[in-house]
Amino acid sequence: MAKAKFERTKPHVNIGTIGHVDHGKTTLTAAISKVLYDKYPDLNEARDFATIDSAPEERQRGITINISHVEYQTEKRHYAHVDAPGHADYIKNMITGAAQMDGAILVVAATDGPMAQTREHVLLARQVGVPALLVALNKSDMVEDEELLELVEMEVRELLSSQEFDGDEAPVIRTSGLKALEGDPQWVKSVEDLMDAVDEYIPDPVRDKDKPFLMPIEDVFTITGRGTVVTGRAERGTLKINSEVEIVGIRDVQKTTVTGIEMFHKQLDEAWAGENCGLLLRGLKRDDVERGQVVVEPGSITPHTNFEANVYILSKDEGGRHNPFYSNYRPQFYFRTTDVTGVITLPEGTEMVMPGDTTEMSVELIQPIAMEEGLGFAIREGGRTVGSGRVTKITK
């Protein structure tokens, strides 16, 4: 068993705990790492509760988020687990995409049932595209009435279904993070059951390599006698030489063929997700393409100008604006590699947005961008970031 540490073949899955601030997310996170350490000591490190609870401040795109990362393994998988203890931290984390989750454990205290914050977290999880949620009915040791537990479970399932998660099939496990940390066998087993459910219910993530090819263009130049080369970092997928591609965004969609792929001045047959490469494009002139467009597998993504988004506006302390903004505010929206001006419309009933606020908004860009739901962007003003958001719905 001692060799298990060096196994690199296990699927890696990013998960997190979400839910109301006082329902025991952090205690449960600590319990998971302790229970798995006791069960598989050669796969896991011992972590104490204090290191998770004192979540370090991280700065993501200049936004301060208190968040802690814990790693642990089951026999089946390697997990990275994020716990954002504060409500505001969780919201910022989800909207800015600081931690992309492949699935999440919704922690609901059996003593309280779902609260307004629980609902908000589930809604956000759907909007940013978390694929699967399962439920830890935490503090279950404190509820002796079986009927009450069943009632809370029903309520949670209805909440999941109302946000298009699978309320009927999602595992709901009764846990007690505190009792599991204390070593109570019944509740240690509840945490083991929870992780078995996570192993089974959260699907293996589709690796970026298996998605359709997409490379944002960072630079364009001409190689005399050969043609136009675009460079950038492939975001996802793979691309073979002589493949047809589309150039999407800013202007009309153009079709072309990739006749050469180069990386660090070496010729390649194929470009992979995560690699910086240059693509030689057949029949296109230097002026036909520009930074901010994307090179994609044909038909895989379309250009759009109008969308709805969830946005976090930086506070003054984070280097954001000093004063509020209103509808018709026209900042730049930075998508992947370029800024495009857009006009903001605030939702009905929202007169203005203050620095430090989270808001929904509708945006109309002056040029189309290759867009899909879940795509992140920064809002900039005079070259500095004043907000960060995600596309929740494409409207045109």
Curated annotation (Swiss-Prot):
Residues 19-26 are annotated as: G1. Residues 138-141 are annotated as: G4. Residues 62-66 are annotated as: G2. Keywords: Cytoplasm, Elongation factor, GTP-binding, Hydrolase, Magnesium, Metal-binding, Nucleotide-binding, Protein biosynthesis. It is found in: Cytoplasm. Gene3D superfamilies: P-loop containing nucleotide triphosphate hydrolases, Translation factors. Residues 83-86 are annotated as: G3. It is an enzyme of class 3 (hydrolase). The keyword Heme does not apply. It catalyses: GTP + H2O = GDP + phosphate + H(+). Residues 10-206 form the tr-type G domain. Its EC number is 3.6.5.3. GTP binds at residues 19-26, 83-87, 138-141. Pfam families: GTP_EFTU (PF00009), GTP_EFTU_D2 (PF03144), GTP_EFTU_D3 (PF03143). Residues 176-178 are annotated as: G5. GTP hydrolase that promotes the GTP-dependent binding of aminoacyl-tRNA to the A-site of ribosomes during protein biosynthesis. This is Elongation factor Tu. The gene is tuf.
